[in-house]
Amino acid sequence: MKTQKKEVYNFQSETKKLLHLMIHSLYSNKEIFLRELISNSSDAIDKLRFESISSPELYENDSDVKIQISINKAQRTLIISDNGIGMTKEDTIENLGTIAKSGTKSFLQSLEQKQNKKNELIGEFGVGFYSSFIVSEKVSVRTRFAGLESNKGILWESSGEGEYNITNIVKKTRGTEITLFLKKEEEEFLETWRIKNIISKYSDHITIPIHIQDYDKKNKTYFWEQINKAKALWTLNKSSITEEEYKDFYKHLTNDQNDPLIWSHNHVEGNQEYISLLYIPEKAAWDIWNRDNKHGLKLYVKRVYIMDNSQAFLPNYLRFIKGLIDSSDLPLNISREILQDNSITEKLRKSLIKKSLSMLEKLAQKNNEKYQIFWNQFGLVLKEGPAEDHENLNKIANLLRFTSMKSNNSEQKMSLKEYISNMNEQQEKIYYITADSYSSANNSPHLELFKKNNIDVLLLSDRIDEWMMNYLSEFEGKKFQSISKEDISLNKLTKEKKIKNKDVSTEMIEFLKKVKNILGNQVKDVRLTHRLTETPCVLLSDSTEMTTQMAKLFSAAGQSVPELKYIFEINPDHILIKKICTINNENELHQWIKLLLDQALLAEKGNLENPHKFISRMNKLLIK
């Protein structure tokens, strides 16, 4: 027989780095490699089932799908095989020679930075095949894609040290067979009982039968024993599933090694029939902030696997939810493209959004401590909701958490209902302020009048907050009001009244005119204010113009930002204003007015265009 020529390939540079991390430092819990390989085999069989719907010949007269594991102690090998879809030569290069996933560099950086969380991160990333090198000195893969001739088989071999070999072989059966040549110190994985325990622990709910070859000492024969239950857990009655089984299934589904925070299992009948099993993780994935990364639910139709990461059923702001949906109404041959425009999909989507939000509502009502864990991990993602989902706006708003002026700390624990329940009797609006940080918001001069009159204010300091507030106009009949806008009125709540010229001294009126003249078009207007108690002046945004925080958002996104012109308000009762009002030297008065404007700009924006000029001006005035 003619010897087939080996082709030598180099691993992609990032794959080399990942292999090095795995082999030398990654899993403290090494047994997970078997879970990863079984999961890959299960996926391969799921893909075969899906493809065979339109091409039944792919079964090659063998529809009895299974995963088999055998041990050879003499050769120190562990073999995991399946009769799934298999791989072509191109598939082996793409799937085994490179990490074909966006965000790889970020992932590797995260691994290096979080040495104590490597297991957790590698599970999130899901690079299952490479985990075989944790316990193996060499890995051999024999595979043939379903439907191809037997002489189109591929042998892939590597010791995980920089290169791999590919050879054409004859393989009579479709599917993939992985042979692990175990390291001497990993011989525990040659014990049948050990492999059975790992399968029961991690893969009991794989829907494909998993068999292990065992030896009958009495009859001196080998036999195949099925280890897992091979039942679709989500199809079972909720009352028959234990909490531990739900948790184990979540870990199998997501590769997350932590328990889920909560889950919701629903069997829906009627106009639409489906089963959903939705989980909320305990911790956010390392790439949760990347809206473009793959996310979504695993889709089944009548128990047949269709696709992973189907984004058609949940919006982006719920991308932290993991799980699956099994529909009885969708066609088996549905594609990703058709799924997006399908009327059944839209109905399922609406239903699943309501189930998801209801799950969070129940958690917030029944277990505030757990809900706070959720909020700390995923609150920023949920804040995208008001902009994306107007239909469920009130439900989302009810789930939001804030800190406030009266909270005296930065922890976001207050709901809008709680804020309203503590409002003053005649208060008609929900007051808030946005800033770059909690400290900036909590120390803003805009709060002075509210502190004086014991009116609470929500302090919003997350980057997304200003954007979110554009879509939150009211909650339970109470309108939201930014306290940094000019159109604020507290007349009903306080004894303060808008300052009128007749109530102000002639000197102060003249001073106001001078300030307007000096600042000219640097500001939109100059006014006396009733808002301030401790600060000499403050800047306000016009009610119709872009706010400071929104301008910062636009700028950070590379968008052009219109020039902001503020309303400059002066506190006539402040001692500094009274002193400046008496200055007769025109140049000195100019310097003081510009210094006041710079101070107000610094308080409002957190920075100045020319800080050196500000410092120089301040030093000169201090010397005087």
From Swiss-Prot:
Molecular chaperone. Has ATPase activity. It comes from Buchnera aphidicola subsp. Acyrthosiphon pisum (strain APS) (Acyrthosiphon pisum symbiotic bacterium). Residues 553-624 are annotated as: C. It comes from the Bacteria. Keywords: ATP-binding, Chaperone, Cytoplasm, Nucleotide-binding, Stress response. Residues 1-336 are annotated as: A. This is Chaperone protein HtpG. InterPro entries: HATPase_C_sf (IPR036890), Heat_shock_protein_90_CS (IPR019805), HSP90_C (IPR037196), Hsp90_fam (IPR001404), Hsp90_N (IPR020575), Ribosomal_Su5_D2-typ_SF (IPR020568). NCBIfam families: PRK05218.1. SUPFAM superfamilies: ATPase domain of HSP90 chaperone/DNA topoisomerase II/histidine kinase, HSP90 C-terminal domain, Ribosomal protein S5 domain 2-like. It is found in: Cytoplasm. PROSITE patterns: HSP90. The gene is htpG. Pfam families: HATPase_c_3, HSP90. GO terms for cellular component: cytoplasm. Homodimer. GO terms for molecular function: ATP binding; ATP hydrolysis activity; ATP-dependent protein folding chaperone; unfolded protein binding. Residues 337-552 are annotated as: B. Belongs to the heat shock protein 90 family.
